[in-house]
Curated annotation (Swiss-Prot):
Keywords: Ribonucleoprotein, Ribosomal protein. Part of the 30S ribosomal subunit. GO terms for cellular component: small ribosomal subunit. GO terms for molecular function: structural constituent of ribosome; tRNA binding. This is Small ribosomal subunit protein uS10. InterPro entries: Ribosomal_uS10 (IPR001848), Ribosomal_uS10_CS (IPR018268), Ribosomal_uS10_dom (IPR027486), Ribosomal_uS10_dom_sf (IPR036838), Ribosomal_uS10_euk/arc (IPR005729). PROSITE patterns: RIBOSOMAL_S10. The keyword Ribonucleoprotein applies. SMART domains: Ribosomal_S10. SUPFAM superfamilies: Ribosomal protein S10. It comes from Methanococcus maripaludis (strain C7 / ATCC BAA-1331). GO terms for biological process: translation.
Length: 102
């Protein structure tokens, strides 16, 4: 049977966990084997900019950070389960990637 690897990433971990819970509920309802959601390390993207644009005065900086949360779910990919997963409402802040394997 084919397996599907579902990779989810988002900057909002609450919405990401909500989508994972929906996929988990579908797997339990259809009775297929599932592994996950496996939390991957959170990537922190940092940008430091100088507050003063003219170069005069004291050096003060703004520090901006964006955290990217990732989850991986491995699931048996029968037709009925995948059809239900495709109908899940995904928020705009969540990116999803589905890869089918033999």
């Amino acid at each position: 049977m084919q397996k599907a690897r579902i990779k989810l990433s988002s900057t909002q971990h609450t919405e990401l966990d909500g989508v994972c819970d929906q996929i988990k509920a579908i797997a339990e309802k259809t009775g297929v084997d599932m592994a996950g959601p496996i939390p991957l390390p959170t990537k922190a993207l940092k940008v430091t900019t100088r507050k003063s644009t003219d170069g005069e005065g004291s050096s003060s900086f703004d520090r901006w950070t964006m955290r990217v949360h990732k989850r991986v779910i491995d699931i048996e990919a029968d037709e009925r389960t995948m059809k239900h997963i495709m109908k899940v409402r995904i928020p705009d802040t969540v990116q999803i990637e589905i890869e089918l394997r033999n």
